[in-house]
Amino acid sequence: MTHFVAIFFSSLFMCSNVFAGSVSSVSLGSLSSALNERMQVMKAVAGYKALHHLPIEDLPREQVVLDHMLQNAQQAGLEPHSVEPFVHALMNASKTIQYRYRADWLSSPDSAVPVRDLTETRQQIQQLDTQLLTAISQRLMTGAFSQEDKEFLMSHLTAPHLSESDKNSLFASLSRIQRQH
C-alpha cells in the first residue's frame, strides 16, 4: 500500500511541475507579445502627437495611466506598490520610443507618419496593459522571474526602437513585482 501511495504522490508532483512549467511558458509568451505590441503602438502615439504638435511627455496623462494600472494590478492579484516601478519603466520606454520615431521623422521628412485617433490608440494600450498584468500575475503563481525568463524576454522583445537598456530597465522592475499575500 505504501508503494502505491508513493507512486501516487510522485505522479501528482510530476503533474504539478508540468502544469507549472506550461503556465510559465504560456504567460511569458503572452507577456512578451503584449509588451511588443504595446511598444509598437507607440509609433501611432508619436505620429498623432507630431501631427498635432503635442509634447511627448504628458505628466497628467501618465498619472491617469499609473492610477489605472495600479487599480488593475490589484484586481489581477498583484501588490500595487511593487507594480509602480514597472509602470514607470514602461512609460519611460514608451516615451523613449516616441522620441526615437520623432527623430527619425525629422531626419527623413518624406517618410509617412502614421496617424490614428489617439482615443482608439489609448483604448488599445489599456487592453494591452491589462493583458500585461494578467500575464505577470499568472507567471508569478509559479514563482519569481528567473534568469531564464529574463533571457527569454530579452530575446523576444523585438519592438522597433526598444533598446537593450530599455529592456533591462523593464525586466529589473518586472522582477520586483509581487503577488498580493
Curated annotation (Swiss-Prot):
Name assigned to this protein: Monofunctional chorismate mutase
Annotated InterPro entries: Chorismate_II_sf (IPR036263), Chorismate_mutase-related (IPR051331), Chorismate_mutase_periplasmic (IPR008240), CM_dom_sf (IPR036979), CM_II_prokaryot (IPR002701)
Principal location class: periplasm
Protein function: Catalyzes the Claisen rearrangement of chorismate to prephenate. May sequester with cyclohexadienyl dehydratase and an aromatic aminotransferase to form phenylalanine or phenylpyruvate.
Subcellular location: Periplasm
Chorismate mutase domain: residues covered: 21-102
Gene field: aroQ
Pathway: Metabolic intermediate biosynthesis; prephenate biosynthesis; prephenate from chorismate: step 1/1
